Amino acid sequence: MTRFLLCSFALVLLYPSGIDMYLVGLPRIAQDLGASEAQLHIAFSVYLAGMASAMLFAGRIADRSGRKPVAIVGAAIFVIASLICAQVHTSSHFLIGRFIQGIAAGSCYVVAFAILRDTLDDRRRAKVLSLLNGITCIIPVLAPVLGHLIMLKYPWQSLFYTMTGMGVMVAVLSVFILRETRPTAPPQAALPQHDAGESLLNRFFLSRLLITTLSVTVILTYVNVSPVLMMEEMGFDRGTYSMAMALMAMISMAVSFSTPFVLSLFNPRTLMLTSQVLFLAAGVTLSLATRQAVTLIGLGMICAGFSVGFGVAMSQALGPFTLRAGVASSVLGIAQVCGSSLWIWLAAIIGLSAMNMLIGILIACSIVSLVLLLVVTPPRVAQYDEEAAVES
């Protein structure tokens, strides 16, 4: 079991590392490539576009050919893309490299969740996904610090060489440590009944798809508007902003790491309801805040709410799928990336302020999700398993 957890964690961590590692070198990259920082900021969107593109096919391939081949190819592509980014001389080639990096990260991300679905039952999967969420929260804090330390002695290209090394390590783990987890097909006579149970149009799956998409939209909106909110509206300098973001990351980590223990006392539905109540409370707090301390409390509620509920919701979303776990993971990833990007784009077009953009999605997410959690309950078997897990 340890090998699957290690490989899954490594596969997932390529995604946030690819986003956060290079940001500290962005001014130098822009200078060397003859582009403005504003032009290179599109590299974030290009990276997400690459991830979404990969998710369109990676899950289906993983279900048909296996998890291990997709993991190996994804890690190998990440290595190649990182080398491309390190060697480019124009901004257009840099963006191409970032797109390919996104394809690689998206493939690995999908496979990681499929592996966890294959190897863990509902109860353990919810706990592991909560831990994974906590580990992922460490990357936005550590990656820029590591990048800064690297650039004290080496040029910005070394950031992508570091990512190359990460890709090589993931590839080695995928080749030598990871074992194939794809379930074998059931007897032909059982296929129609099995397929009906694993439909992507299943009411329960669609409800968890919407809940997780809205939750990711909340957290990505928070990340996107935090520089404007804290440095322009609240008057923080870069140092204070970094400290505030580190504090929020610590809240996320603390809640994520404690969630597995809380799951031993409460059922998953209670944690998801708590998550949405925290989102609603955060929206109300931010809309009424007149002091910086109160605003920071509201932002802390966002981090806590996401951390306590997202892993559980993802586990429930993947629960009904055995043979189609890869496809289900792909659909979840695409919806989350595209849904959050769509909201941020629409809010910018409408002209919402940073604060109103955040408050709007908090209120919408909490109300819609609370209704779905109260109306759409898990299948009877899953409910029984949840209750048995809590009692034990």
Curated annotation (Swiss-Prot):
HAMAP family: MFS_MdtL. GO terms for molecular function: transmembrane transporter activity. It is found in: Cell inner membrane. The keyword Transmembrane applies. SUPFAM superfamilies: MFS general substrate transporter (SSF103473). It comes from the Bacteria. The keyword Cell membrane applies. PROSITE patterns: MFS. The lineage of its organism: Bacteria, Pseudomonadati, Pseudomonadota, Gammaproteobacteria, Enterobacterales. The chain crosses the membrane at residues 4-24, 38-58, 69-89, 95-115, 131-151, 158-178, 209-229, 246-266, 270-290, 294-314, 331-351, 357-377. NCBIfam families: PRK10473.1. CDD domains: MFS_MdfA_MDR_like (cd17320). Belongs to the major facilitator superfamily. DHA1 family. MdtL (TC 2.A.1.2.22) subfamily. Keywords: Cell inner membrane, Cell membrane, Membrane, Transmembrane, Transmembrane helix, Transport. Disulfide bonds: none annotated. It is a multi-pass membrane protein. This is Multidrug resistance protein MdtL. GO terms for cellular component: plasma membrane. InterPro entries: MFS, MFS_dom, MFS_trans_sf, Multidrug-R_MdtL.
